[in-house]
Every structure is written in structure tokens, then in C-alpha cells.
Curated annotation (Swiss-Prot):
GO terms for molecular function: GTP binding; GTPase activity; ribosomal small subunit binding; small ribosomal subunit rRNA binding. Belongs to the TRAFAC class TrmE-Era-EngA-EngB-Septin-like GTPase superfamily. Era GTPase family. Residues 47-51 are annotated as: G2. It holds the Pfam family MMR_HSR1. It is found in: Cytoplasm; Cell inner membrane. The gene is era. This is GTPase Era.
């Protein structure tokens, strides 16, 4: 493993940490459990994360600024997929540490593709072997870790379970050791750089993803049209964009039941995060070809890198 030494007992450390990996290995779950609250949306469906999400964790003198990225995947022709790949790749620029997340004993061509992209990275790369709680034959883990250690000179290799919060402390400790001495960039109580509007849109999109499962088309986006505090109530109006009428019917459901359920669950999460009563209104609109249009992506805040 790489021997990267840092001065002992620094007064203050701060830096950027990119969390990368192929889709559905648990990157967003890892970030959420490190922070101690939900910031990135999660589901069993791969490629749920579309944006870089900045999560900030401050523990005493150490401030780690985590960037949760979309899963890197094989090249796709759609503009949305190109955007997601660019978002993931851009997270590797000017970071201080990379956490490369893989799925326990599984190693795929997509993992190899991510590893290939990491060859250009000069900072420490920590390999986080996630979901070890699901291993049926634990005796296979050590040989697998030894095989992984030969693929790259990793700064650390840490088996963990993000969901069960197993071995997260060694991971955070390793990240902290590799961060540079620096003043903190953010207030110690700040956990993200994202706006409340962005977080509201992500909460709605998560509920759509979780409720629809295999029915969900990837080409679903959420646009916040109103986000306004009036007295003790937060009024939020969100537009759900799909590409076809059939997708619209799926999201609305029989007599609007599915859409109401999505709204109820999203509202509960918003009230918990924003600390106020929320009045949430949802609409569904067909916008054909938005996931293939660079212009449409930019209008939704998904700009080129």
C-alpha cells in the first residue's frame, strides 16, 4: 500500500473526497451514513444519482468535503448518460482523496473501467469493499482482498457495510489522515452546499424511484417551480417530467393514488429536513426527448462540465 505520510496532530485539516464506483455499489448510502442523515437519494435501481452532491462532515479539526457522484458506466448514446459520466469524471479533478467503492466479491468490467479512469489520479485512492454483511462465505473475503490489492497500489483497502455502518470509522479515519492541513472551507455545522430547492427535487425523485421500481423509466426528472415560505408553512410545487404518455399514466396511477403516495412520502421527508410544515403539490408533464437534449438538460440544471 502507498506510504503517504502526514504531520502528526495537525491543527486543522480540510479537503475534497470523491466517492466513485460503478452504479449501485452503495455510494450514496455510504455518504448518507457518514453524514448521519440522508443527503443523496438511494434505491435498488442503478444510476439513481445524477448530480454531484457535496456532503460536508466536520469532526473536530478535520473537515471532509465528500462528492457523491453518478455511477460510472459503459458509454451510452443518450445525453443524460453522457452528462452522468461527465459528472463522475469531473469529480476526480483537484480532489485530495478518492474513495473507490466496489460490491463485496463482485468485480465486473464496469469496475475495471472505473479503475482505468483512476490511473490518471495522483492523490491517495482508498478501496472501500462494500456490502460485506451480505457475504455467505466470509472465508472468501481475505483472498478477494489480496487479489484486489494487486490491481493498484491502494492507499488503504477497507471492507465495510455502509448500510449496517460497519467499519465506517476506519474509513473516515483513513480519509482524515490523507487530507491536507488547511482551514475549514465551510462552517462546522453545514452538511451540504446544495440548495433547499435541489434537495426537495431529489426527495421527490427518490420516492418515484422507490415506488415504481422496475416500472420506472430512467428518463424522469423533477423541476421545482415554487419554493416559498409563508408563515410557518413551506409551499413547494414540483413538476415531474417524463418522455411518454404511458410513463405519465404509470406515475399518476389509478385515480391518482400513486402520485398521492409519492407526494405524501416526499412531504414527510421534507418536513423532517426543513423543520417546518410542508404543502407539496405535484404535477406530471410529458416533455418528449428531454433526456436526449443537451438544451433540456441544461434547463434542468444538468450543465456540461
Amino acid at each position: 500500500m502507498t506510504d503517504i505520510t502526514r504531520p502528526e496532530n495537525p491543527e486543522s485539516r480540510c479537503g475534497f473526497v470523491a466517492i466513485v464506483g460503478r452504479p449501485n455499489v452503495g455510494k450514496s448510502t455510504l455518504l448518507n451514513h457518514i453524514l448521519g442523515q440522508k443527503l443523496s437519494i438511494t434505491s435498488r435501481k442503478p444510476q439513481t444519482t445524477r448530480h454531484q452532491v457535496l456532503g460536508i462532515k466536520t469532526e473536530g479539526p478535520v473537515q471532509a468535503i465528500y462528492v457523491d457522484t453518478p455511477g460510472m458506466h459503459e458509454d451510452e448514446p443518450r445525453a443524460l448518460n453522457r452528462y452522468m459520466n461527465k459528472a463522475a469524471a469531473s469529480a476526480l479533478i483537484d480532489v485530495d482523496v478518492v474513495v473507490f467503492v466496489v460490491d463485496q466479491l463482485a468485480w465486473t468490467s464496469a469496475d475495471e473501467m472505473v479503475l482505468e479512469k483512476l490511473k490518471r489520479v495522483k492523490c491517495p485512492v482508498i478501496l472501500a469493499v462494500n456490502k460485506v454483511d451480505k457475504l455467505e462465505k466470509r472465508e472468501l473475503l481475505l483472498p478477494h482482498l489480496e487479489a484486489l490489492s494487486k490491481k493498484r497500489d491502494f492507499a488503504e483497502i477497507i471492507p465495510l457495510s455502509a448500510l449496517k455502518e460497519t467499519n465506517l470509522e476506519p474509513l473516515e479515519s483513513a480519509v482524515g489522515r490523507f487530507l491536507p492541513e488547511s482551514v475549514h472551507f465551510y462552517p462546522d455545522d453545514q452538511i451540504t452546499d446544495r440548495s433547499e430547492r435541489f434537495m426537495a427535487a431529489e426527495m421527490v425523485r427518490e420516492k418515484i424511484t422507490r415506488q415504481l421500481g422496475a416500472e420506472l423509466p430512467y428518463s424522469v426528472a423533477v423541476e421545482i417551480e415554487e419554493f416559498k415560505h409563508q408563515g410557518n408553512t413551506l409551499h413547494v410545487s414540483a413538476l415531474i417530467l417524463v418522455e411518454r404518455e404511458g410513463q405519465k399514466k404509470i406515475i399518476i396511477g389509478d385515480k391518482g393514488e400513486r402520485l398521492r403516495s409519492i407526494g405524501q412520502e416526499a412531504r414527510v421527508d421534507m418536513e423532517r429536513m426543513f423543520g417546518s410544515k410542508v404543502m407539496l403539490r405535484l404535477w406530471v408533464k410529458v416533455k418528449r426527448g428531454w433526456a436526449d437534449s443537451d438544451r433540456a438538460l441544461k434547463s434542468l440544471g444538468m450543465s456540461d462540465f
